């Protein structure tokens, strides 16, 4: 695979597609990154994460285990994903049974500083900056706020 990596990036057991760029101080662990992706500076992507093709994960974002990001998604600066519904469940119990998965569908846009709980964000949906997404958001919608509420439902594209 031919991709570009900054000297300061840490990549351990990650699969990275052709044409992708990994910027300074990014940390990638046991994850899969598609083709023509950009992973910004100071991003952490944990194990069991799958990222499709043509995805941008902007600087200072945290993509935790059990997240799937489909093709053509834009993740803004400082976006945080959460998988532990009752922290610190793993430390407390040694079990990941309280963990949930997140799926961000094709063409979605996640605004800067959004927090994404274990949910599904529909195709072509836009999440506003600073939103806290605690429930599934259907396709072709715009959701903003804390907690995130749908303010526009565009229906089928």
Task: For each feature predicted by the language model, list its residue ranges.
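Flexible, glycine/small-residue-enriched loop-and-beta-strand segment within the central core
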Residues: 1-7, 12-15, 22-121, 146-147, ...
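C-terminal/domain-terminus segments
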Residues: 122-136, 140
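Conserved active-site beta-strand element of glycosyltransferases/polysaccharide synthases
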Residues: 143
């Amino acid at each position: 695979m031919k991709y570009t990596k900054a000297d300061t990036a840490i990549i351990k057991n990650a699969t990275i597609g052709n044409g992708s760029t990994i910027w300074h101080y990014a940390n990638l662990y046991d994850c899969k990154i598609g083709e023509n992706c950009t992973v910004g500076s100071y991003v952490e992507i944990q194990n069991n994460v799958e990222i499709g093709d043509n995805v941008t994960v902007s600087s200072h974002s945290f993509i935790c285990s059990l997240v799937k990001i489909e093709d053509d998604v834009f993740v803004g600066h400082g976006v945080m994903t959460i998988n532990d519904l009752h922290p610190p469940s793993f430390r407390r119990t040694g079990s990941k049974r309280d963990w949930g998965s997140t799926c961000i569908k094709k063409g979605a846009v996640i605004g800067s500083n959004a927090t994404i709980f274990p949910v599904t964000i529909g195709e072509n949906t836009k999440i506003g900056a600073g939103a806290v997404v605690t429930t599934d958001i259907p396709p072709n919608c715009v959701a903003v706020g804390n907690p995130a509420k749908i303010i526009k439902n565009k229906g089928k594209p």
